A protein has these predicted regions:
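Charged, low-complexity, helix-prone segments enriched in Lys/Glu/Asp/Gln
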Residues: 48-50, 60, 98-102
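Short, intrinsically disordered N-terminal pre-domain segments
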Residues: 1-17, 109-117
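Amphipathic, interaction-prone secondary-structure segments
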Residues: 21-56
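Compositionally biased, intrinsically disordered linkers/stalks adjacent to structured regions
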Residues: 88-117
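Short secondary-structure subsegments characteristic of cysteine-rich extracellular domains
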Residues: 66-90
Length: 117
C-alpha cells in the first residue's frame, strides 16, 4: 500500500492527496479542497494484471455561450497491462520512463491536444 498521503507536483506546486477510500486492490486519494484526485487500482484477468493510475484536476470553467460557471475535470491516466510473469519492476520502469520522456518532449502535448496521432 502506498503511503498516505501521496504528494504530486503540478507546475512546481506540491499537492497533498489523502486516501479517502481503499478496497482491496484499489485506493482513491483527494486533496482537501477536492480539486485534485488520484486513483490507483489493479485488476487481474487470466494471466495478466492491469494497473490503472488516474490523476484528475478540477477547475471552475465559464461556458463561453451562456457565461455560466461550472466545474470541469481534466484526467491523465495510464494503464499498465502486463503478464504475471516475464517482466520485472525495473523493466517496466524503463518503459514507463520512456513514455514519460516522450510525452513531456516539447510540442508533444500540443500535438495530442490537437488530436494528432
Amino acid at each position: 500500500m502506498f503511503t498516505d498521503p501521496i504528494t504530486i507536483t503540478i507546475n512546481g506546486s506540491a499537492k497533498t492527496l489523502a486516501r479517502i477510500k481503499s478496497t482491496g486492490t484499489s485506493s482513491d486519494y483527494a486533496s482537501s479542497d477536492g480539486n485534485y484526485t488520484m486513483t490507483v487500482s489493479h485488476t487481474m484477468k487470466g494471466d495478466r494484471v492491469r494497473t490503472l493510475i488516474k490523476v484528475g484536476q478540477r477547475v471552475v470553467a465559464t461556458d463561453p455561450l451562456s457565461s455560466e460557471n461550472d466545474y470541469a475535470w481534466l484526467y491523465d491516466q495510464r494503464v499498465l497491462d502486463r503478464p504475471i510473469v516475464g517482466f520485472d519492476a525495473t523493466t517496466i520502469g524503463y518503459l514507463v520512463a520512456a513514455d514519460n520522456a516522450w510525452i513531456v518532449t516539447a510540442g508533444v502535448v500540443g500535438k495530442l491536444f490537437g488530436m494528432e496521432s
